[in-house]
């Protein structure tokens, strides 16, 4: 009887309808039928059964299996790649307030319009102490809008955090901060980095999205001040069909944009046919450069296992845009006491549909991208039908999302 073995670091992952061969060493993914997966197992484990010669020859010619002196003792599992690896949380968002002076139509944080809550200085210190004790080295202070907090309190928060973390970033909207306040931060919390958002380089369009006249002028003035003061800063925007972006201005640093998550006020009303075609995960767009790196990063950098988000009410969430999951409330407690290990280990295995998909170890999960109120629903933009092993038509999906006339755009 001939014996075979897998040719290097190769894993077979089974799905509901089809299977996938992860050829890590040769940087390839092969979509195969279950008969092929069965043939691989039977061949390398030395099972006494008739092997399909055509499939066997294809496996040999593609270097999936090679002849061997003896059969393998067991099929390796792709999770073997993760042995010895650790998931260490190093970053946390701290929502110092959910109050905001803007009314951005896409904002993931809708609570600011319903329930006003800002952290007290003592609450903030407790949060910082617990994060530092847990080993968090990087934080970002966010809102709402941090500058709705009294200056004395906010500056005390910045000073306290500055002395306890390796990296600290303040994310604000740029409409309430003065040049003098920026100068104070540059002098008194020198390692602070600044982040703010600008979604259009056309005044009327930016103000339309924020729903506050004059916001564009104030934001761009802040960007100019940051550039003149030589502070470390970045600015970002979102892709939305609701406004025109215009010609990019030079504010001294690269400008980056991201797709709107369907959280808070974010909804499909911000997407048109063009944006949906960019966003949908299709057979053509499901690609990777380095399969090993992709698989390891998806496991090690799963958002729920990398971040904490502490709300202004001291509730601890796994993600800044995902509040359907919670570790618990930090008020009067230690962070180590409330951390939910099941959230830290959250993966595609927990997601409906994805748990039955053979590509689940090569596909990043983002919980805010579920379309309904079901927090375990698969991402709305994935076109792979794992139950039937086929990729859905993108035009048909766009019609479902935007209406029957959408593709005609």
Task: Map each language-model feature to its residues.
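Residues immediately within or flanking Cys/His clusters that coordinate Zn2+
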Residues: 93, 97, 101, 300, ...
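Residue-level structural signal for beta-strand termini and adjacent loop
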Residues: 35, 152, 322-324
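Conserved alpha-helical substructure of the radical SAM core
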Residues: 58, 62-67, 71-192
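A broadly conserved sequence feature marking short terminus-proximal activation segments
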Residues: 53-76, 299-300, 304-339
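N-terminal pre-core extensions flanking Radical SAM catalytic domains
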Residues: 1-112, 132, 399, 407-409
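Flexible mid-to-C-terminal extensions adjoining Fe-S/redox cofactors in radical SAM and related proteins
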Residues: 7, 322-409
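Radical SAM enzyme [4Fe-4S]-AdoMet core and its adjacent flexible, acidic
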Residues: 10-12, 192-330, 377
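Short glycine-enriched, charge-decorated loop/helix-capping segments at active-site entrances
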Residues: 111-115, 208-214, 372
């Amino acid at each position: 009887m001939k014996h075979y073995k897998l040719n290097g670091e190769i894993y077979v992952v089974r799905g509901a309808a089809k299977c996938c061969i992860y050829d890590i060493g040769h940087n390839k993914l092969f979509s195969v039928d279950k008969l092929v997966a069965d043939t691989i197992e039977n061949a390398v484990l030395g099972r006494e059964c008739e092997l399909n010669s055509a499939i066997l020859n294809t496996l040999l010619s593609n270097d999936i299996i090679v002849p061997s002196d003896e059969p393998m003792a067991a099929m390796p599992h792709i999770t073997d790649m993760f042995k010895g690896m650790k998931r260490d949380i190093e970053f946390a968002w701290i929502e110092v307030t959910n109050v905001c002076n803007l009314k951005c139509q896409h904002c993931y944080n809708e609570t600011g319009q319903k329930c006003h809550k800002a952290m007290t200085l003592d609450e903030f210190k407790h949060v910082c102490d617990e994060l530092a004790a847990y080993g968090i080295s990087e934080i970002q202070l966010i809102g709402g809008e941090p500058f709705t907090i009294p200056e004395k309190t906010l500056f005390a928060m910045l000073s306290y955090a500055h002395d306890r973390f390796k990296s600290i970033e303040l994310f604000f909207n740029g409409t309430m901060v003065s040049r003098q306040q920026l100068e104070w931060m540059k002098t008194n919390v020198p390692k602070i980095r600044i982040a703010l958002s600008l979604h259009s380089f056309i005044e009327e369009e930016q103000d339309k999205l924020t729903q506050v006249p004059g916001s564009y002028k104030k934001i761009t003035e802040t960007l100019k001040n940051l550039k003149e003061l030589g502070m470390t800063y970045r600015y970002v925007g979102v892709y939305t069909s609701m406004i025109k972006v215009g010609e990019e201005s030079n504010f001294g640093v690269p400008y980056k944009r991201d797709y709107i998550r369907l959280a808070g006020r974010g909804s499909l009303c911000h997407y048109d046919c063009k944006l949906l075609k960019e966003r949908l995960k299709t057979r053509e767009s499901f690609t990777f450069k380095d399969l090993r790196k992709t698989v390891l990063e998806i496991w090690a950098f799963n958002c729920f296992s990398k971040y904490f988000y502490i709300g202004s009410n001291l509730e601890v969430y796994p993600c800044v845009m995902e509040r359907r999951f919670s570790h618990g409330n930090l008020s009067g407690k230690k962070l180590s006491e409330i951390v939910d290990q099941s959230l830290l280990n959250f993966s595609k295995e927990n997601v409906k549909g994805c748990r039955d998909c053979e590509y689940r170890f090569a596909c990043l999960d983002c919980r805010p991208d579920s379309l309904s109120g079901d927090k375990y629903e698969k991402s709305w933009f994935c076109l792979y039908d794992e139950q039937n092993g086929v990729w859905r038509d993108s035009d048909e999906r766009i019609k479902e999302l935007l209406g029957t006339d959408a593709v005609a755009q």
